[in-house]
UniProtKB/Swiss-Prot annotation:
Keyword Disulfide bond: yes
Compartment(s) where it occurs, according to its Swiss-Prot or TrEMBL record: Secreted
Binding site for beta-D-mannose: 51-55, 59, 63-64, 170-174, 178, 182-185
Originating species: Colocasia esculenta
Function field: Mannose-specific lectin. Shows agglutinating activity towards erythrocytes from rabbit.
MF (Gene Ontology): D-mannose binding
Signal sequence interval, chain numbering: 1-23
Main location: secreted
Assembly information from the UniProt record: Forms heterotetramer of 2 chains 1 and 2 chains 2 arranged as a dimer of chain 1 and chain 2 heterodimers.
Domain of life of the native organism: Eukaryota
Name this polypeptide is given: Mannose-specific lectin TAR1
Annotated GO CC locations: extracellular region
Annotated motif Carbohydrate-binding motif 1, positions: 51-59
All copies of domain Bulb-type lectin, residue ranges: 26-131, 145-229
Amino acid sequence: MAKLLLFLLPAILGLLIPRSAVALGTNYLLSGQTLNTDGHLKNGDFDLVMQNDCNLVLYNGNWQSNTANNGRDCKLTLTDYGDLVIKNRDGSTVWRSRAKSVKGNYAAVLHPDGRLVVFGPSVFKNDPWVPGLNSLAFRNIPFTDNLLFSPQVLYGDGRLTAKNHQLVMQGDCNLVLYGGKYGWQSNTHGNGEHCFLRLNHKGELIIKDDDFKTIWSSSSSSKQGDYVL
């Protein structure tokens, strides 16, 4: 099954943001970005740490790179080919996920259920067994306030917040992106009642009203898989 990524601004707006302008997320790493020594990605009880002993450890997730004491001042980088790479301070490679794919935009996301997943073409994920979490039905994935995973739903006045941007599914049925230099909306103000936004397993964003009538869609349907907005 594909693990695909929808980038919020490029996917919805067709805008391009310089990589240098994109700050490191608290629970994700974009291609070209680096997690420095003692850096963290966090999501709920899960904490991915690039330790000062050069070991990459997912706490409460029962996973590690097994590279303790293999280098100093190590850094984790996600390449433009979807490969996670740990490098020593001299630039030598200590560990890599060996999941190299086609060149493109990727995101390594610390999933709410404790998986570290690279979204893009299907490339790399670890599947730790965490009692009480791995047994959850997919629809019960804990909500993350800056990411939407298929098939999660954003209800009226619900929002996704990333740095100075907010994507809001307003109570008036309009989907609006606030913040930054650019703004955007679905132009569906007043077109329905009790509307909600859903990301389906084909990567399509859909606004429906309380009668499940489709008010708006991104028309970006792709192959069946797991997606993240």
